[in-house]
Swiss-Prot record:
The gene is rps18. Its main location: plastid. It is found in: Plastid, Chloroplast. This is Small ribosomal subunit protein bS18c. Pfam families: Ribosomal_S18. GO terms for molecular function: small ribosomal subunit rRNA binding; structural constituent of ribosome. Residues 1-19 have a biased composition (Basic residues). GO terms for biological process: translation. Keywords: Chloroplast, Plastid, Ribonucleoprotein, Ribosomal protein, RNA-binding, rRNA-binding. GO terms for cellular component: chloroplast; mitochondrial small ribosomal subunit. Residues 1-23 are annotated as: Disordered. Belongs to the bacterial ribosomal protein bS18 family. Part of the 30S ribosomal subunit.
Amino acid sequence: MDKSKQLFRKSKRSFRRRLPPIGSGDRIDYRNMSLISRFISEQGKILSRRVNRLTLKQQRLITIAIKQARILSSLPFLNNEKQFERTESIPRPTGPRSRNK
C-alpha cells in the first residue's frame, strides 16, 4: 500500500466487552429482590433499557417483575427517604415589622 492510503486508514482499537447485567442463571422474578433492585433508581423509578444495557425481552420481564413486586408490597412505589435533612433554623424576630422605604 502506498503512503497516501495508509494515512487515511483507521487503526483498529481493542475494546473490552462488557458483561451482561443478567447472567444466564439469574431468574427474572418478582421474588428475586437482589436482581430487581439493581434496575431501580434511588428515587424508585425503573431505569431505562439503555442505562441497564438489557435486551428488549429482558427489560420487559424486569418491568413486569418490578410492577408485580410493587403491587404485592415487597417493593415501594416511591422511595420516600429524606435526602435533605433540615439544619438548625435561624430564629425569626417576632416583633412588629418595620418597612424600609
